[in-house]
Amino acid sequence: MSVDQATVRRVAHLARIAVSEEELEPLKGELNAILAFVEQLANLDVADVEPMTGVIPMELPMREDVVTDGHYPEKILANAPEAEGGFFTVPKVVE
């Protein structure tokens, strides 16, 4: 696939980028180089490559899922205009 100056103008317009006439030819070359590289990638045989999410295999440590009260519910409820029974009291919004 080859990019012409009209395509560069259209892409610049869609990206809301102001491009001068002098910049069109260099951008055309850069876009053609990028597309040539993508075409090379499309031709690679990756049938035997396992899917991955990153280059370096990493596992994040999981912590135990424990429910707590936050260790300071009184301080949290002190920020509320009204509280009752350990909960925020809010105005009724649905009849």
From Swiss-Prot:
GO terms for biological process: glutaminyl-tRNAGln biosynthesis via transamidation; regulation of translational fidelity; translation. Signal peptide: none annotated. Heterotrimer of A, B and C subunits. It catalyses: L-glutamyl-tRNA(Gln) + L-glutamine + ATP + H2O = L-glutaminyl-tRNA(Gln) + L-glutamate + ADP + phosphate + H(+); L-aspartyl-tRNA(Asn) + L-glutamine + ATP + H2O = L-asparaginyl-tRNA(Asn) + L-glutamate + ADP + phosphate + 2 H(+). This is Aspartyl/glutamyl-tRNA(Asn/Gln) amidotransferase subunit C. Disulfide bonds: none annotated. InterPro entries: Asp/Glu-ADT_sf_sub_c, GatC. The lineage of its organism: Bacteria, Pseudomonadati, Pseudomonadota, Alphaproteobacteria, Hyphomicrobiales. Allows the formation of correctly charged Asn-tRNA(Asn) or Gln-tRNA(Gln) through the transamidation of misacylated Asp-tRNA(Asn) or Glu-tRNA(Gln) in organisms which lack either or both of asparaginyl-tRNA or glutaminyl-tRNA synthetases. The reaction takes place in the presence of glutamine and ATP through an activated phospho-Asp-tRNA(Asn) or phospho-Glu-tRNA(Gln). Keywords: ATP-binding, Ligase, Nucleotide-binding, Protein biosynthesis. It comes from the Bacteria. Belongs to the GatC family. It is an enzyme of class 6 (ligase). The keyword Ligase applies. GO terms for molecular function: asparaginyl-tRNA synthase (glutamine-hydrolyzing) activity; ATP binding; glutaminyl-tRNA synthase (glutamine-hydrolyzing) activity. SUPFAM superfamilies: Glu-tRNAGln amidotransferase C subunit. Its EC number is 6.3.5.-.
